[in-house]
């Protein structure tokens, strides 16, 4: 306390000098600043002026004055120990109070300059005096806001780790009573800001402080367009505060030309505009530009992103995603309609890692998810779809999917395709032997009974010709429930298997469906070689020697499948052995 009090007294003397100079913002700013450069301090003074104009806009809203001494106090922390936090926290409530007092831009500018003087390295007393002179309507509030903001700043300078309220109170009993008001005024963001800034030296707790301050500000400012303007202007201020309060040491390293660019950009708005002229739109483009410039400073840039900036911030602010918390927390109630409509994109960004699927994102995620789900789920059905590709129903419905998938999954299906091709050959031989339906049904049922493409190649190779009768008979026993499968097989060629088959089969591909023909055409070059060593002598013969004349004849038979009538499972079972033999004969011959 004592350690902070002596520097505070020195700062008070500086404040007196700076107060007189505060009305000449240029000299007071550079002198009081002792910042990186006179130009930087001049920019800060301009930013303070812009903030004053913003506060004047808020004064049009007619809320309390307390906010006002804050901009100065915000920037008043050259060492930035807790400056930005205090600035942000106090800036908004004090802007409210200033609105209540209805300060004129002129008075606001003077008070701001007083704040500049104080910022210039002096505490709030000169600002207190200037505020008393200019803001007579509510000197207590100005004092209280200054007492809340100004003294803690010297405290932050002298002993940043010290609880700043007490340090400021001890050197300045005259303003100590004002701390009660700022506590009430600041609605807990003030004290929390002080404690957080004093403890964390203003670096980490700032987002939380911003949230508290913005929540309180949002509560007070929700109804008023000036509230929005304050939000945007205070949010640009937040960057300014970061640079101004932190300007010297700037724990965040935010004392960068970016911040000053921000200030110079904000300044034109403040100077150009009378109190009401500073429209949210004007400041928002500014905030957008500043937000982009301020990306290195996530909280300030995200806070700078105003409701209107946020839609753009969403499109462009996907850059802001790294700043989820601030963008989410900064979304004030007014901003939330916009932020909800567009900001649902923002909110998933805060939650993005956990619950990116926001209401709006969900349609996209659902549409994309539907894309994913068809990809995912049909990949599961890939086995049945590929198995039943010979069926027209599933073949027609799944053919497009399975085609795309078969391209990707063609490698596991190659075996299944060749197995299918053999079975098609079987079917065609059976159809040549008056039993097209029975064996086709058996084949399909066998394919369906087989668990998946991976097992299918194995089954086709291991039991390619010899297990077929048994399997076909078993599947044929199941055929009555599988009659739908037979129906699918009964009319495959037009819908299910759109036979570009001659090309593909002449290429050596033996896929029953166009999709499988595509996937197998991918592998057509290797397929004869890969499948040649299959256990049955017929597969290599059929794949290497047989395909062209064999499939020419059998494709016509496949086309005849539509007209062919389904067979009884008993016939199918009977048909299986000799048809297999005939198939082997034909494939070999």
Swiss-Prot record:
Phosphoserine: residues carrying this PTM: 306
Annotated Low complexity bias: 147-161, 299-308, 325-334, 351-360, 374-390, 450-465, 509-547
Tissue-level expression: Highly expressed in ovary with lower expression in testis and very low levels in other tissues tested including prostate, brain, kidney, spleen and liver. During spermatogenesis, expressed mainly in spermatogonia with very low expression in spermatocytes I and II.
Disruption phenotype: No overt developmental defects with mutant adults appearing indistinguishable from wild-type. Two-fold increase in H3K27me2 and H3K27me3 levels in germ cells in testis but males display normal testis-to-body weight ratio and normal fertility. Increased H3K27me3 levels in postnatal oocytes and slight increase in the number of oocytes with lagging chromosomes. No significant differences in the number of primordial, primary and secondary/antral follicles of pre-pubertal females but older females show a reduced number of follicles at 16 weeks.
UniProt GO BP: chromatin organization; oocyte development
Annotated spans, Sufficient for interaction with EZH2: 482-490
InterPro entries (UniProt xref): EZH_Inhibitor
Subunit structure: Interacts with PRC2/EED-EZH1 complex member EZH1 and with PRC2/EED-EZH2 complex member EZH2; the interaction blocks EZH1/EZH2 methyltransferase activity. Interacts (via C-terminus) with SUZ12 which is a member of the PRC2/EED-EZH1 and PRC2/EED-EZH2 complexes.
Protein name as annotated: EZH inhibitory protein
Organism whose genome encodes this protein: Mus musculus
Gene responsible for this protein: Ezhip
């Amino acid at each position: 306390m004592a350690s902070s009090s002596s520097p505070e007294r020195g700062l008070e003397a500086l404040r007196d000098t700076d107060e007189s100079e505060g009305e000449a913002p240029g000299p007071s700013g550079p002198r009081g600043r002792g910042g990186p450069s006179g130009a930087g301090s001049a920019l800060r003074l301009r930013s303070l002026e812009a903030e004053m104009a913003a506060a004047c806009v808020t004064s049009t809203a007619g809320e309390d004055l307390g906010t006002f001494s804050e901009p100065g106090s915000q920037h008043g922390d050259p060492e930035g120990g807790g400056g930005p936090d205090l600035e942000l926290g106090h800036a908004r409530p004090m802007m409210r109070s200033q609105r209540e007092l209805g300060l004129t831009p002129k008075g606001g500018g003077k008070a701001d300059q007083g704040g500049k003087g104080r910022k210039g390295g002096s505490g709030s007393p000169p600002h207190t005096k200037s505020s008393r002179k200019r803001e007579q309507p509510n000197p207590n509030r100005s004092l209280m806001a200054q007492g809340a903001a100004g003294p803690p700043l010297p405290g932050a300078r002298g002993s940043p780790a010290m609880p700043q309220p007490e340090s400021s109170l001890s050197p300045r009993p005259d303003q100590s009573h004002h701390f009660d008001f700022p506590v009430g005024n600041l609605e807990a963001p003030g004290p929390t800001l002080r404690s957080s800034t004093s403890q964390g030296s203003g670096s980490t707790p700032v987002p939380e402080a911003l949230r508290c301050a913005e929540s309180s500000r949002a509560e007070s400012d929700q109804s008023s367009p000036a509230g929005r303007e304050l939000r945007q202007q205070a949010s640009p201020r937040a960057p300014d505060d970061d640079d101004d309060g932190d300007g010297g040491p700037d724990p965040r390293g935010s004392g960068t030309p970016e911040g000053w660019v921000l200030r110079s950009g904000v300044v034109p708005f403040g100077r150009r505009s009378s109190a009401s002229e500073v429209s949210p739109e004007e400041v928002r483009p500014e905030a957008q530009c500043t937000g982009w410039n301020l990306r290195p400073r996530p909280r300030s840039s995200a806070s700078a992103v105003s409701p209107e900036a946020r839609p753009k911030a969403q499109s462009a602010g996907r850059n802001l995603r790294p700043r989820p918390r601030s963008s989410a927390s900064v979304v004030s109630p007014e901003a939330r309609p916009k932020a909800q409509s567009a900001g649902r994109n923002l909110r998933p960004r805060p939650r993005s890692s956990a619950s990116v699927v926001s209401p709006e994102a969900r349609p996209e995620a659902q549409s994309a998810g539907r894309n994913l789900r068809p990809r995912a789920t049909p990949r599961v059905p890939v086995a049945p779809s590929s198995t039943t590709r010979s069926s027209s129903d599933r073949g027609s419905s799944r053919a497009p999917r399975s085609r795309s998938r078969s391209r990707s999954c063609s490698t596991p299906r190659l075996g299944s395709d060749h197995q299918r091709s053999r079975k098609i050959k079987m079917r065609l031989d059976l159809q040549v032997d008056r039993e097209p339906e029975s064996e086709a049904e058996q084949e399909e049922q066998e394919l369906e009974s087989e668990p998946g493409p991976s097992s299918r190649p194995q089954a086709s190779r291991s039991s390619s010709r010899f297990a077929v009768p048994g399997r076909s008979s078993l599947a044929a026993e199941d055929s009555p429930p599988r009659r739908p499968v037979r129906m699918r097989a009964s009319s495959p060629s037009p819908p299910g298997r759109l036979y570009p088959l001659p090309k593909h089969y002449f290429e050596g591909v033996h896929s029953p469906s166009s999709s499988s023909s595509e996937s197998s055409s991918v592998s057509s070059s290797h397929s004869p070689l890969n499948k040649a060593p299959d256990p049955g002598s017929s597969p290599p013969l059929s794949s290497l020697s047989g395909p062209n004349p064999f499939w020419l004849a059998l494709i016509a038979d496949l086309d005849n499948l539509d007209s062919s009538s389904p067979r009884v499972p008993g016939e199918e079972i009977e048909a299986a052995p000799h048809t297999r033999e005939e198939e082997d004969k034909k494939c070999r011959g």
